[in-house]
Structure formats: structure tokens, C-alpha cells
């Protein structure tokens, strides 16, 4: 190691700093505990750059180890210093090297006989404990290669995985689990890694990672019988509370005092926690009459309600308007009843965890009533050969592309449990276990252009966006079908608008040229309120579909990027972003971009470059052999 490296790292100056923050001691009065940040654990301050060169020849071996002065340390060891000998604070050289991430010194000391699991310091900890608590993944990997045991407990009863969890070192938690540590391991006080993460770490990780490893969310600790949800409430950890509720944490679990998480939230008068915990109870059917409880407990029924409500609402809006009733007061009361019904269904049965169900229901309902209108209102008025036949052919293509967009694999990146653990170990041991390329939810190395979808909760290759209108992500596996869906949907809507205008021309005694715009609008709305309602739906859908189709085609053909990449280009190092443009390494010219995206082939005249984006980890791929297209 170069000597200058020591001046740009953090150094711990004494073992008393190891226990600045409470560790794994029994917590006898959880209601009095304040949440503490893992960033303030007293391990030392960043060292500034030296303005002069010290005479290292006068340094003792502890100071030289802390600063990583390899030559001075070797000089003293060769002169007879015993590397196993603890200093006056009962701390060994291996501890000091581990806490300050001096990998070359660790290798040297172990080669000279240092004991890798020697206990030391006030907390009677191993060097691996010190490295873990400080968050040095590379040091953890190195020590475990030399046989360090992560399951050993320190003086407070914690093993390494508990320290990593409570200090938010997600990469170390992942590595320890991948190396065989039990995800539900309890410390001496009965606290699991999940409990520590819920109590100490106010971010999604490592809690999210632990949940992905199928941790037991409803275990209680040894002393208080608090579950992870109890500890999250005690700490006011709203981020983790949401994760635990999504993972199925038992909101009614009671601790040794008979208190639920909701009881603790009420004691703290935290409105956010109280509301979310009550909503979680209601979602499980508690606090409601028995009949509603049974229905609300049925997730499939709730999904059907969300899908079916738009069918009812769209029909009722048009039906009420079409009623032969002159009194708008009566119609207003009827619309009020529709609104009240929707509010009741929304509060009682809508499951907001099913993000796509309602938009998908709106799309399906709109198209259903449009087709009903087409066949029952337009069929006898329009020419079969020139209108109905093309419309039906377009509908077949629309249904096909919609079905493929909805139900096909968008490019989910899959891996077995063993593959996930192998990936974690490989990335950690090569110094690449970075959350920018590793997904802590799916536990996979993220291919280039991929992204974890928060709605679907899975990583998607060449992720474009999550589309609620098709109830699926749009990615490498279904993006072409999604474009086909937009294209044929736009034509279907155009035909619907044409049908409405033709219907008014045949059945309504008014014309735009004769009566003017406003009179024409009021006349056609009065002539057939249902038709006018369908026309408004068609115009609304035409606007967003047309805009979306144009944006998608521009991104695909002219920019060579996805929607996600365009929105987050500054986050990705491989994009060159200016105030006016985005330069993409995946942009190979308009014609080639289109051929590659749609995989066009034409009798050998051109052929696309096919890339498996589920396995592509770099921006370099063979563009020459595929050559995009060739003119013959």
C-alpha cells in the first residue's frame, strides 16, 4: 500500500469509541428508547491531508497500523514485535488494521501468525466485528477468506450480521447471508437482524434485502416479545413500517405487555403510523362487520371490484344522461348516488397495493362499451367492406398486441436462490457489490438498461416504464407488442370517432355548417347523450395515445433510449447529457434503431442486431457482426 493512501481514509483512534452507541445490550424499557442514527457511531473522523511529511521512523506500530504505513509496520515486526500482542487497551494490531481497512497489513500480520478471531477491546470483539461495524466489506471478505467466523458474538451478544443490520451495511448483510449465516439468527438478547434494521436503520435497506431472503417477520425478541413491527414503531421508522406491512407483518401481534404495534403508535401520538396501521387492519377485514370482513379478506374479490367498477360507472354515466327525464335535479341526484357508491367501493374494497387494477379496468371498460356502441349503434349505418371489415381486422391486431403486452414476460431477470448467493459472493469478492449494479430486492446483478420496478417488485431488462393501462411493465420482452398496441388502439379510436360523427349525420337534425359550433354541440348532445359520452371518451383516449405513441417513436428511432433512460439519464454514467441533448451509446442512427427495435428482416436486405438484455452487463456489444442492416 502506498503511504499516501492512509491520509484519505477514516481512522478509529481508540477502542472506547467502539461502544459510543448502544449495541446489543438488553433493552428493558423500549418505550424510553430514542432512535439513533448509525452514522454517529464514533469510529473516528476523516483525516485531512498532511501539509508536511512526518518522520514515520518515530511512530509506534499501533499508529503506523492505523495510518497504513506498511514499511514502518514491517520494520517493527521484523525487529521482533509480536503481532499477537495486544496493546494497553487490549486491542491487537489486527483489530486496528481491520477497523481502518488496511488490507495489506491484515495479510501481512496473518502471515506472521496473527490470530484472525482474537478477541480484544472493551467489547471483547474480533477484528471481523470491528470491520463489520465500520462497514468495510472488502475487509470482511478478506478476513473471512482467512477463516474468520462471523457467527461469534461480542461482549454485547451480537454477531456480525446483527452489527451489519443495525448500522445499515446492506452489502455486508447480503454477503454474510450468502456465506451461510442464518437470516433469522438471534443475538444473545433474542434480537434478529430484521429487528435491528427496523429499529436502527431509517432506509429501505437492509430491511428490504432481509425480506427478500424470506426472513420471519413475526418473530418476537427474547425479553419484550416485540416483533420487528414493534421496533419500527418504537423508532418512528416509517419507511420500514411500510415495508413490513407489505410483507405481511401481523399488526395484532402483542408484546409481553399485551401491546400491539398500533397501541405503541397511539402512545406516541404519531398520526402517520396510526393511520397506516389502522389501514392495514382494515385491509385484513378487521374493524368491519363480519360479511364485509369476509369479502375484504378475499384479495381476488377486491381485484374484481377494482376491475369491474369502471364498467358500471361508464355505463351509468351514459345511461343516466340518456334517460328520458327532463328534470336535471333528478339526474343530479342519480349521479350523486353513483358518486357515493364509488366512494363506498373505494374505501371498502379497493386495494391500493394493486396499482394497475383500476387503470386496467378503465381501459377494458372503455373499450368494451365502445365495441357495444359499434355493434349496436353503427352496424347498420356503415359500409361493411370499407368500414366494418378494416375495423374488425384492426381489432384482431389490437387484441393480440394488448394481450401480449399484458400477459407476456416483459423481461424479468430471473435467478435461483443459489445463483443469487453465488452472485453476491462473486461481486463482494471482486469489490463490485455496489447497490448501483446490485438489486437488493431481487438479489441479482443488474444488467445494463435494466431497472427494478417498484410496482411489479421485480427487475426488468431494458426497462421502459410500468404501464397501468396494460397492467404490466414494458421492457425488452414486450416493448414491440406495446408499440403495436398503441398503433392499433389509435386507429380503433379514430374509427370510433368517425362512427360517432356518421351517426349524428344520419340521426340528428343538425349540421356544423348550418347551425355553427356551439349549437351543433348542444344538439348532438341532446340527440344522443350516450353517443356524445362515447365521443368524449374517444377524444380523451385519442389525445394520450397519440402523444404517447409519438414520444415512444421519437425515443426509439431518434434517441435510441427508453423512457426510464430519458428521465434518469444523469444517473447513468454511460449517457452524455447536456442542457439540450442526450447522447446515448445505444443510438446507432434512425434507420438502424428502428430495424433493431422491431427486428425487421427483408429477404437478406437488412437484418437486426439481437441483444439479450437480460444478460448484457456492459454497453459494449457486437454491432458489427449483426451490422444492423445491409443493402444488397
Swiss-Prot record:
Per UniProt, residues of the DHHC domain are: 437-487
Variant or mutagenesis effect after changing residue 67 to A: Decreased binding affinity for SNAP25
The stretches that face the Cytoplasmic side, renumbered to this chain, are 1-304, 347-357, 403-480, 551-632
GO biological process: what's one of them?
axonogenesis
Any idea which residues are catalytic in this one?
467 (s-palmitoyl cysteine intermediate)
* One Gene Ontology cellular component annotation held by this UniProt entry: cell projection
Which InterPro entries does the protein's record reference?
A: Ankyrin_rpt, Ankyrin_rpt-contain_sf, Palmitoyltrfase_DHHC
Side Lumenal, residues:
379-381, 502-529
- Provide the record's note on post-translational modification: Autopalmitoylated. Autopalmitoylation has a regulatory role in ZDHHC17-mediated Mg(2+) transport.
ANK repeat segments run 51-86, 89-118, 123-152, 156-185, 189-219, 224-253, 257-286
Protein's name according to its UniProt entry: Palmitoyltransferase ZDHHC17
- Which organism does this sequence originate in? Homo sapiens (Human)
Amino acid at each position: 500500500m502506498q503511504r499516501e493512501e492512509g491520509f484519505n481514509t477514516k481512522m478509529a483512534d481508540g477502542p472506547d469509541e467502539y461502544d459510543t452507541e448502544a449495541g446489543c445490550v438488553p433493552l428493558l424499557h423500549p418505550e424510553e428508547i430514542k432512535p439513533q442514527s448509525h452514522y454517529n457511531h464514533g469510529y473516528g473522523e476523516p483525516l485531512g491531508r498532511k501539509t508536511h511529511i512526518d518522520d514515520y521512523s518515530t511512530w509506534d506500530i499501533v499508529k503506523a497500523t492505523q495510518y497504513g504505513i506498511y514499511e514502518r509496520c514491517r520494520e517493527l515486526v521484523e525487529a521482533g514485535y509480536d503481532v499477537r500482542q495486544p496493546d494497553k487497551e487490549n486491542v491487537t494490531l489486527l483489530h486496528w488494521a481491520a477497523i481502518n481497512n488496511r488490507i495489506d497489513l491484515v495479510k501481512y500480520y496473518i502471515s506472521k501468525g496473527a490470530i484472525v478471531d482474537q478477541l480484544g477491546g472493551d467489547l471483547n470483539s474480533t477484528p471481523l466485528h470491528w470491520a463489520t461495524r465500520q462497514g468495510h466489506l472488502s475487509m470482511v471478505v478478506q478476513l473471512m477468506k482467512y477463516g474468520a467466523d462471523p457467527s461469534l458474538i461480542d461482549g454485547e451478544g451480537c454477531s456480525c450480521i446483527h452489527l451489519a443490520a443495525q448500522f445499515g451495511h446492506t452489502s455486508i448483510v447480503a454477503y454474510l447471508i450468502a456465506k451461510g449465516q442464518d437470516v433469522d439468527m438471534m443475538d444473545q438478547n433474542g434480537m434478529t437482524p430484521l429487528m435491528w434494521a427496523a429499529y436502527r436503520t431509517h432506509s429501505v435497506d437492509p430491511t428490504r434485502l432481509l425480506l427478500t431472503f424470506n426472513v420471519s417477520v413475526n418473530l418476537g425478541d427474547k425479553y419484550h416479545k416485540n416483533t420487528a413491527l414493534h421496533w419500527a414503531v418504537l423508532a418512528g421508522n416509517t419507511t420500514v413500517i411500510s415495508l413490513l406491512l407489505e410483507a405481511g407483518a401481523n399488526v395484532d401481534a402483542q408484546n409481553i405487555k399485551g401491546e400491539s404495534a398500533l397501541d405503541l403508535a397511539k402512545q406516541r401520538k404519531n398520526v402517520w403510523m396510526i393511520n397506516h396501521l389502522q389501514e392495514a387492519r382494515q385491509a385484513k377485514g378487521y374493524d368491519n362487520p363480519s360479511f364485509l370482513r369476509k369479502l375484504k379478506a378475499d384479495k381476488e374479490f377486491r381485484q374484481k371490484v377494482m376491475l369491474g367498477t369502471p364498467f358500471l360507472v361508464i355505463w351509468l354515466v351514459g345511461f343516466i344522461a340518456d334517460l328520458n327525464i327532463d328534470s336535471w335535479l333528478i339526474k343530479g341526484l342519480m349521479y350523486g348516488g353513483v358518486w357515493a357508491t364509488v366512494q363506498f367501493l373505494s374505501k371498502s374494497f379497493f386495494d391500493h397495493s394493486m396499482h394497475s387494477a383500476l387503470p386496467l379496468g378503465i381501459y377494458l371498460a372503455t373499450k368494451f362499451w365502445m365495441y357495444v356502441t359499434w355493434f349496436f349503434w353503427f352496424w347498420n349505418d356503415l359500409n361493411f367492406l370499407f368500414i366494418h371489415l378494416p375495423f374488425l381486422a384492426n381489432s384482431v391486431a389490437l387484441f393480440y398486441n394488448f394481450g401480449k403486452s399484458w400477459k407476456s414476460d416483459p423481461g424479468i431477470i430471473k435467478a435461483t436462490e443459489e445463483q443469487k448467493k453465488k452472485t453476491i459472493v462473486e461481486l463482494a469478492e471482486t469489490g463490485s457489490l455496489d447497490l448501483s449494479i446490485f438489486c437488493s430486492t431481487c438479489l441479482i446483478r443488474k444488467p445494463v438498461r435494466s431497472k427494478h420496478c417498484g410496482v411489479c417488485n421485480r427487475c426488468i431488462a431494458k426497462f421502459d416504464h410500468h404501464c397501468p393501462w396494460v397492467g404490466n411493465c414494458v421492457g425488452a420482452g414486450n416493448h414491440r407488442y406495446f408499440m403495436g398496441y398503441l398503433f392499433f388502439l389509435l386507429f380503433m379510436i379514430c374509427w370510433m370517432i368517425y362512427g360517432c360523427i356518421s351517426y349524428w349525420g344520419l340521426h340528428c337534425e343538425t349540421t356544423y355548417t348550418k347551425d355553427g359550433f356551439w349549437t351543433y354541440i348542444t344538439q348532438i348532445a341532446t340527440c344522443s347523450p350516450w353517443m356524445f359520452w362515447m365521443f368524449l371518451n374517444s377524444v380523451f383516449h385519442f389525445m394520450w395515445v397519440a402523444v404517447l405513441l409519438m414520444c415512444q417513436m421519437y425515443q426509439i428511432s431518434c434517441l435510441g433510449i427508453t423512457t426510464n433512460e430519458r428521465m434518469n439519464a444523469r444517473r447513468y454514467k454511460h449517457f452524455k447529457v447536456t442542457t439540450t441533448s442526450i447522447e446515448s451509446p445505444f443510438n446507432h442512427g434512425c434507420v438502424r434503431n428502428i430495424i433493431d427495435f422491431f427486428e425487421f428482416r427483408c429477404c437478406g436486405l437488412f437484418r437486426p442486431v439481437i441483444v439479450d438484455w437480460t444478460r448484457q452487463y456492459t454497453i459494449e456489444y457486437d454491432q458489427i457482426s449483426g451490422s444492423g442492416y445491409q443493402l444488397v
